[in-house]
A protein has these predicted regions:
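Helicase-associated low-complexity regulatory tails and linkers flanking the ATPase motor
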Residues: 1-7, 11, 131-137, 159-163, ...
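Conserved SF1/SF2 helicase motif Ia
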Residues: 122, 126-159
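Pre-Walker A (Motif I) flank of P-loop NTPase domains
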Residues: 97, 102-108, 146, 431-434, ...
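Conserved pre-motif I regulatory segment
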Residues: 26-110, 119-120
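A short beta-strand element within the Helicase C-terminal
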Residues: 498, 502-519, 524-530
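Conserved glycine(s) of the Walker
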Residues: 116
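Residue-level detector of conserved catalytic or cofactor/ligand-binding positions
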Residues: 656-669, 674
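The conserved Walker
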Residues: 113
Length: 675
């Protein structure tokens, strides 16, 4: 059995769908509502008249799911294989596909970090919502729904979901502005004008957050429920999440808490009592679409073949039970696989329901993410035998940083300084940042202290500590999230120090240097760590040509970069050599063996030229041609009832003028004499 068979499935499906969309057969087979959406999203003149459009990876993911669900009308993962590529079933784990969790319409979207999977999520939600609302009541197919559950893996992604559907927080306020949600901000991309009022009304009235309580807030016909994975935790796991803290011990001893904190108010007691009823409420819905963001958290594989379901998946199984084809699950992840084995036998086992694959290679070559650079400095290669783990005493307590770790941090700071000096000459608003990933929270204070010893101020370092599962306590999170989410806007902080917390949802653009002090061998953790810095920093069109030439220089010609514009530098860690070699072999990374000669070369050949002092005296403008003028000729029909009467001659006169019987006509030949 192949462990990557679903990638082959995704490739074959994509070819089928491309052909069907290009020849028009896909449009002919879908509902009128879906036709409206697909034309608005992917066809002219709409795509020519706006500045933002879906890129090819987003488009293909949307089309593939619509094709499977609406055209082929699959009801299980096995059915996807049977209808798209039946020969691949011989290489599948059929006992795996027979599990309850795959006996539903279930689709996994594999998209590289930073390539906009949230936009795909929005589009698919709109497709389901509008079809459900416009289906004839007596002819309902059961394949569309107005009920949605969107699940995040942690606090960062959950906050991003609230931004996307509830709107961003107002300045210095806990209130959200509904006119800043994604669908309103980008309505010209997502929603055809005829559907906008009903979509905006639905979003405003039917979004339910975990704080409001799923099943407690009264909504109209349908809901968009936002939550994170804690919804699916068992009571035992909830108790164990922070079991070593004093407050949790007190909660165990005194579940009804006296005092001044409001622990006994009715709302608080209701929340505790109703916690389990959220799953019951979702289970009782007649239909539902579940969207899992960062879905690699759902699976747990200790061998090639799952041993035990994680609580997240158990909860989904309960919700899906008895819904059959009225339950749809869409999983999004840049890394939809489990890692099995160890050492040379380590391999990736991809989820069996992957239906689209827009990988890092495609994203990088398309210029949708930064280009990776392995910072292989002379001092690092010469001292490869240094210890790169934190110093610990005989009781394994961390007592300091090793020489190798100090060396890596200095290399990262040096690169950050070079970028700061070069970028500010071109654009003072471009502020590069560095991220340090530590092995555990006992190391982060030593890293913070060392960075300050190297000259950084208190405000320049933001330390975020999390527990073993990568979670920050909610009260701590409230203190750091404002600084964290606005990090692109301000000069400080310059360096973010974390353990697991920032693996997902950290959607900032200015991370230009990553120092991976954490020596984990997990492929998923490595890819997720690298993914934190992939989002583009220099998005303006004037930099496109410079970036294209740089990608060619680094990825194809295997030479040093000419500039650092939209380059992500990873300070090389000896424990990750295999991972780095894989990146190099797949043409996903280049090597930077030293600093550019001086800061002026950081931005390559681009120079900043100011305006003339009297530029306002020049009345210049550049017309934007949206559509060339064309004469449209329409055939017209003559309505005899609307013709004016003919009065120039009488009826008798006309009879005299007309030819009489027996008249003959004589033809004359005309000659042209030539000199």
């Amino acid at each position: 059995m192949r462990n990557d068979i679903s990638l082959e499935l995704a490739s074959r499906l994509t070819e089928q769908v491309k052909t069907a969309f290009e020849n028009g057969s896909l449009l002919d087979a879908v509902t009128p509502v879906t036709q409206d959406l697909l034309k608005f999203w992917f066809m002219g003149p709409y795509t020519e008249e706006r500045s933002k459009n879906f890129h090819e990876g987003q488009k293909q993911s949307i089309l593939n799911i619509i094709y499977l669900h609406e055209v082929l009308q699959v009801t299980t993962v096995e059915e996807i294989y049977r209808q798209v590529a039946p020969d691949l079933l011989a290489e599948c784990n059929l006992s795996d596909l027979a599990k309850e969790k795959y006996r539903i319409p279930k689709y996994a979207v594999k998209m590289a970090t930073g390539t906009g999977k949230t936009w795909v999520m929005h589009a698919l939600l709109l497709w389901q919502l509008l079809n459900a609302r416009h289906e004839e009541q007596e002819e309902r197919s059961g394949r569309y729904t107005q009920n949605f559950l969107i699940v995040a893996p942690g606090l960062i992604v959950y906050d991003r979901l609230k931004d996307a559907y509830c709107g961003r927080l107002k300045e210095n306020c806990t209130e959200r502005d509904p006119f800043t949600n994604d669908l309103y901000l980008h309505k010209d991309l997502f929603i055809p004008p005829a559907y906008r009022d009903e979509v905006f009304s639905f979003i405003q009235n039917n979004v339910v957050t975990k704080e409001e309580g799923i099943g407690r807030k009264i909504t109209g016909n349908g809901l968009i429920a936002l939550t994170n994975w804690h919804l699916f935790l068992s009571d035992e796991e909830k108790e164990n999440m922070d079991s070593d803290s004093a407050p949790s011990i007190i909660r165990d001893l005194l579940p009804i808490t006296p005092g001044l904190s409001g622990g006994n108010v009715l709302e608080a007691l209701d929340r505790k009592y109703l916690r389990g009823s959220e799953l019951d409420y979702l289970s009782e819905l007649s239909d539902l679409m579940v969207i899992n963001d960062e879905a690699h958290h759902i699976h747990e594989n200790k061998k090639q073949g799952e041993i035990e379901e994680v609580e997240w998946q158990k909860g989904l199984n309960k919700i899906a039970h008895n819904k059959g084809g009225h339950f749809i699950q869409i999983d999004f992840s840049a890394t939809p696989y489990d890692t099995v084995g160890s050492g040379k036998k380590k391999m990736k086992c991809y989820f069996p329901h992957i239906i689209s694959d827009f990988d890092l290679s495609q994203a990088m070559k398309s210029g949708l993410v930064k280009t990776l650079l392995l910072d292989r400095r002379q001092e690092l290669t010469d001292l490869a035998n240094l210890d790169y783990n934190a110093l610990r005493d005989e009781r394994k307590k961390v007592i300091g940083l090793s020489d190798g770790q100090r060396l890596m941090l200095r290399a990262g700071l040096r690169k950050l300084q070079i970028l700061e000096e070069g970028f500010i000459k071109l654009d003072s608003k471009k502020r590069p940042k560095m991220m340090v990933i530590c092995e555990d929270t006992n190391v982060t204070p030593f890293v913070e202290s060392f960075l300050k010893e190297e000259g950084l101020a208190e405000k320049d370092v933001l330390r975020i500590d999390s527990n073993a599962k990568g979670e920050v306590k909610e009260k701590d999170w409230m203190q750091v999230k404002e600084r964290l989410f606005n990090i692109d806007k301000y000069e400080s902080p310059k360096v973010i120090v974390s353990v697991l917390m920032l693996r997902e949802g950290f959607d900032v653009n200015n991370i230009c240097v990553i120092v991976p002090l954490r020596s984990t061998q997990s492929a998923i953790l490595l890819e997720q760590t690298v993914g934190r810095g992939l989002r583009l920093m220099w998005r303006e069109p004037e930099y496109s040509e410079e970036k294209r030439e740089n990608r060619l220089q680094v990825l194809v010609k295997k030479k040093a970069p000419k500039s650092y514009i939209d380059m992500l530098s990873i300070i090389e860690h000896p424990a990750f050599l295999d991972f780095y070699n894989d990146l190099m072999n797949e043409e996903l990374a280049g090597i930077d063996e030293g600093d550019l000669p001086d800061g002026s070369n950081v931005t390559g050949d681009i120079i900043k030229v100011g305006l003339k002092d009297n530029y306002q005296d020049y009345d210049l403008f550049w017309p934007l041609i949206i559509k060339e003028q064309e004469e449209e000729i329409h055939p017209s029909e003559i309505d005899i009832n609307r013709l004016a009467p003919f009065t120039d001659f009488s009826y008798e006169q006309l009879k005299e003028i007309l030819a009489k019987p027996g008249e003959s006509f004589i033809s004359y030949a005309v000659f042209c004499l030539k000199k």
